[in-house]
Amino acid sequence: MILTVTMNPSVDTRYQLDELVIDDVNRVTPEKTAGGKGLNVARVLGQLGDDVVATGLLGGHMGAYMAELMDANGIKNDFVPIKGETRICLNILHAGNQTELLESGPTIAPEELDAFTAKFTELASKADVVTISGSLPRGVEAGYYAKITGIAENAGAKVLLDTSGASLEAALKSEIKPELVKPNLTEINGLLGTSFTTDDVDELRAALASDARFSDIPWVVVSMGAAGSVGFHNGRAFRAKTPDIPAVNATGSGDSTIAGFAHAIAAGADDETVLRTANTCGKLNAMDPMTGHLVMDRWDEVYNDVVVTEL
């Protein structure tokens, strides 16, 4: 089983407009989905045929509505109830542009976090892979992801951690490390105090190898936008280049990439297959107007066009 964690989920509402007229009425038809990075991961894993359970925190009327959306989408879920109201996030697509309005979300009480820790411990004991994605809600300290990473890894699960900022830094400094981290180039430069470009792969490899924070993490994947990504796994280094595709909605492509990693790692795939699968998922999400959803009938075409080269 693969477990996905979304600590700060949202009801995502998408508006498609030919033009956004400022300071005037814009009539729209909303498309609503159960949102949050971990739920995007869960949706894609469901498409890939994995046994997946989504967990996290839900509260209020929006939380109840979100549970209905998950059930309607066939996403198995086991969330912990909270008193606060689950947030709403707006995504406005207009004239080739994308504008997002994101609520902060509720503040989590200590007893609510304790209840989630107990729930997570129970679910992680049954999981082969755990994905932890996105931001922490208010009231939760930055070291919490490091804490539950240790719980899952001690239970025998492999943790794929997709976060940034203080939460990522705390996980890198912890005694028990995740199986995979996936910072982008800007984030990795911030962590290393460097200014590497997409051409500086050898220098990046050397910097990671000499930094004790990354020494016990089997997979370090650095996403580089249109330039693809580089992956470092147990002393080996790879560059993945992806094909040009007709992008419709790039939101959720990073989450879909994490789903691809989870799917392939859970299946025990070799390094090249892991990277090709993950990058294929990211591209196929960008080709679909729905966030966290793959254009599966293009799988073979895109997968075969992803080039993975060992460095």
Locations of the language-model features?
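Glycine-rich phosphate/adenosyl-contacting loop at the front of the ribokinase-like
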Residues: 1-55, 62-65, 311
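Short acidic, glycine-rich surface-loop motifs adjacent to enzyme active sites
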Residues: 124-139
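Conserved N-terminal subdomain of the carbohydrate kinase-like
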Residues: 47-127, 300-311
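Gly/Ala-rich phosphate-binding loop of Rossmann-like dinucleotide-binding domains
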Residues: 46, 149, 153, 266
